[in-house]
Amino acid sequence: MIAAQAKLVYQLNKYYSERCQARKAAIAKTIREVCKVVSDVLKEVEVQEPRFISSLTEIDARYEGLEVVSPTEFEVVLYLNQMGVFNFVDDGSLPGCAVLKLSDGRKRSMSLWVEFITASGYLSARKIRSRFQTLVAQAVDKCSYRDVVKMIADTSEVKLRIRERYIVQITPAFKCTGIWPRSAAQWPLPHIPWPGPNRVAEVKAEGFNLLSKECYSLTGKQSSAESDAWVLQFAEAENRLLLGGCRSKCLSVLKTLRDRHLELPGQPLNNYHMKTLLLYECEKHPRETDWDEACLGDRLNGILLQLISCLQCRRCPHYFLPNLDLFQGKPHSALESAAKQTWRLAREILTNPKSLDKL
């Protein structure tokens, strides 16, 4: 048994140093190329409208606010200033979303975003995005990369196609630090020792983002009043939880396997599903020794089996917001074929670790 485990870990480490590192290097090169174009577009936006200041900065070879959706798809979060005059209201009526309401006694005129406040005093995510979309469309025509960048039509999101190969979504957002959403109040679960109290305090201080994008639960109902709501995102908190042990290596292997074998019609699976299931695996195996290099094969196997289970039940709860189902709106047939394909992949890796050479 131990010999089989060691063989799998050896093959996974080989897979990591060959396939995963090559994927990382290719993505890093793409990011540099894409960020040049996006920075130029955002510089042009800022000239027209100084309230939208580009926050895309490179720190230690990482771009703050940039998320890799897939090797050809990225999301850039554009942090907005001055959320202060609004109260964060998160009553759970819209899973995964919250609203920003003008604080009592505050005048609209005190807000930097006065014309985007609705009659009932809410700061409308949709109105801000609509204005931003207009500005980006104008900037694309003026910027120095106008020959290689186009705006993607037929969506309320701000999406660019770059060199006909890459898609970048630019999402206006507010950073919320020092508060924690009521809809995530159940975290951390009291009977689970992971993460420890110090890490929990760090994560809660890190806070979350409020994004101006289509709500998961409202896709296709854009005209409703609820489209004024903001989407909760916990990227920094999640990244902080995945520090230490073989967690980030495990995520890298999962992403690479997904990109190469689980990019299926109907797009049932993305890398965020992999990250979510890795967080649940951390809860199931709370001791740091469970995340030693020697356990990489066991942890990967556990996550793939959990993924199959989620696909078969057609439900994948968000890690911090369990009322939000990350499979919502995905075609059942796509989830079914993803379950079959994941099962084939897991069986192959477990019964014949050498097959990783070909995967």
Swiss-Prot record:
Keyword Cytoplasm: yes
Top-level taxon of origin: Eukaryota
GO terms under biological process: eye development
GO cellular component, one term: cytoplasm
Pfam families linked to this entry: Mab-21, Mab-21_C
Localization in the cell: Nucleus; Cytoplasm
UniProt KW keywords: Cytoplasm, Developmental protein, Nucleus
Ranges in a coiled coil: none
Record-stated family: Belongs to the mab-21 family.
Purpose of the protein: Required for several aspects of embryonic development including normal development of the eye.
Protein name per Swiss-Prot or TrEMBL: Protein mab-21-like 2
Organism: Xenopus tropicalis (Western clawed frog)
GN (gene name): mab21l2
